[in-house]
């Protein structure tokens, strides 16, 4: 039971990392990215291949996965950044699905649908399953704490205020002299790096990854996390991720509680419950449990905000 609870906690931490990354892309910059699972997969596969095939240290693999996800994020952003709304969502979703199909069919990259197994974890053999899980939980929690403070500082920085200005009215931000394209690309790069970090940490914990793990449904879970916690709020992103993982795991026990419900029907009921939860959140908590709170820019000695920080 303890092993199961620790695994859930690690999963919640990974979801929190993804939610924090998406909070920058979607919550702050207003970019609708439905391909977040693609960047998650880039980080997982890059770190897994580098450590498993090349024998590189795990820290090097995680760093490489994070960096590569950021680079891919920049490339995708440069192609899609001038698109808006539904068009951006469709293109990013297409990127993630194309990546998943390629990884499924090209056996020479990562064994296709069989996936990568035996991905090393830090001191897994020396510590044994119990201590390894506790160690890894500490690593994931540390990563969440560091990323949380980075994103939280970003939210209240001049850069964060420009992103919110772009989200609220892109034309006004452009009229104020801000290079909208550059800011969008930077937001995409930062968020993609966080998604890649989450993917790398996930792969080294489970020691196995396959294309089926990176289905679009994962994107929905992270979106649900942000909507639950509150878009644009770092605390809300973490809270939403924890609540969504708790909800997903608790609904696994539906089958024994409902007489005559088969495993297949229980899985369908689980997805239905998730959909109902999303509708209820949108109905009663449109801005999330912890709505975005924008701090005013710092004042100068004259009592006015610096010109560069008014956006």
Predicted regions and their residues:
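Transmembrane alpha-helices and adjacent helix-loop boundaries
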Residues: 1-311
């Amino acid at each position: 039971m303890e092993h199961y609870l620790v695994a859930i906690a690690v999963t919640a931490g990974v979801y929190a990392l993804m939610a924090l990354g998406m909070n920058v892309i979607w919550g702050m910059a207003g970019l609708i990215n439905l391909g977040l699972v693609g960047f998650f997969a880039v980080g997982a596969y890059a770190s897994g291949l580098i450590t498993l095939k090349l024998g590189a240290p795990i820290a090097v693999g995680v760093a490489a996965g994070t960096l590569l996800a950021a680079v891919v994020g920049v490339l995708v952003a440069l192609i899609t950044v001038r698109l808006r709304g539904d068009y951006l969502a469709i293109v990013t979703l297409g990127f993630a699905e194309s990546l998943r199909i390629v990884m499924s069919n090209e056996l020479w990259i990562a064994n296709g649908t069989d996936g990568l197994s035996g991905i090393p974890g830090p001191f897994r053999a020396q510590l044994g399953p119990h201590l390894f899980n506790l160690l890894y939980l500490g690593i994931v929690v540390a990563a969440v704490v560091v990323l949380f403070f980075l994103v939280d500082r970003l939210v209240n920085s001049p850069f964060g205020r420009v992103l919110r200005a772009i989200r609220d009215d892109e034309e006004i931000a452009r009229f104020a002299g801000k290079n909208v394209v550059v800011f969008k690309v930077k937001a995409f790069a930062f968020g993609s790096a966080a998604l890649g970090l989450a993917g790398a940490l996930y792969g080294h914990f489970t020691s196995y990854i396959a294309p089926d793990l990176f289905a679009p449904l994962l994107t929905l879970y992270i979106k649900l996390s942000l909507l639950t916690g509150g878009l644009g709020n770092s605390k809300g992103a973490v809270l939403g991720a924890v609540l969504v993982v708790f909800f997903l795991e608790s609904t696994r026990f539906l089958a024994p509680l409902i007489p005559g419900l088969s495993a297949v029907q229980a899985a369908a009921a689980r997805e239905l419950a998730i959909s109902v939860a999303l509708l209820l959140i949108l109905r009663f908590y449109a801005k999330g449990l912890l709505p975005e709170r924008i701090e005013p820019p710092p004042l100068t000695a004259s009592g006015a905000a610096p010109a560069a920080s008014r956006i």
